[in-house]
Design a protein with these regions (language model features):
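Extended, charged interaction scaffolds in large complex subunits
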Residues: 1-204
């Protein structure tokens, strides 16, 4: 994901109206070739697609970017991964993508700071300004690290463990579909991105 974001960063910083799916698809293919993703099953990689969400005034490419996985032509999977389930996975992706975007931006900001700080640190008053900037940057990193750890451990890993336990006792297709729905709903609920938490999510 880091490789993909590095490659896409410049393009996604453009206005959403100037973003084209085929251009981003080329960048994703490049990211696959330059990362460990190249060792995944070719069929899996062939089903990974880029989609663009409907844009709003002022949106950048970051705001409309979406990774999708094609399952509609695989009868067994399509039965379990219904349209409603896939839409919920898109909500989860959007949430995780925003977190990764913030982490990526903080990392780039720090890199830029380290590259240019020596040019200004001898200017009177700048040392104190840079000190406060460092403190602010540290607080943001700490906050994002806390959010990231919560999502990984308390949300994703916790829900995945329950899902794997459910799969050990599944009796039929209907139960499998229900377990899949429960898995996704658990993530949405704990990550505060389901409908009942819409107001809280917007405030955050």
């Amino acid at each position: 994901m880091q490789c993909l974001m590095d490659i896409l960063a410049k393009e996604l910083s453009n206005p959403a109206s100037s973003i084209y799916k085929h251009t981003l698809q080329g960048f994703m293919d490049q990211a696959v070739r330059q990362s460990n993703a190249q060792y995944h099953d070719p069929d899996f990689l062939g089903r990974l697609m880029i989609n663009l969400q409907e844009s709003q005034p002022g949106d950048k490419g970051w705001d409309i970017f979406m990774l999708d996985y094609r399952v509609h032509d695989l009868a067994p999977l399509a039965t379990v991964f219904t349209e409603d389930v896939m839409n919920n996975y898109k909500k989860i992706f959007n949430f995780l993508w925003r977190i990764k975007r913030i982490e990526h931006q903080l990392s780039n900001t720090w890199r830029t700071y380290k590259e240019h700080v020596h040019k200004f640190e001898k200017i009177r008053g700048m040392k104190d300004i840079f000190h406060r900037l460092n403190l602010c940057h540290h607080e943001m990193l700490h906050f994002m690290s806390t959010i990231h750890n919560y999502i990984m451990v308390e949300v994703l890993e916790s829900a995945w463990k329950v899902y794997l336990d459910d799969l050990k006792v599944v009796k039929d297709l209907d139960e499998l579909i229900e377990f899949q729905r429960k898995f996704v709903d658990s993530i949405l609920d704990k990550a505060l991105i389901n409908e009942k938490n819409n107001d809280l999510y917007r405030n955050l």
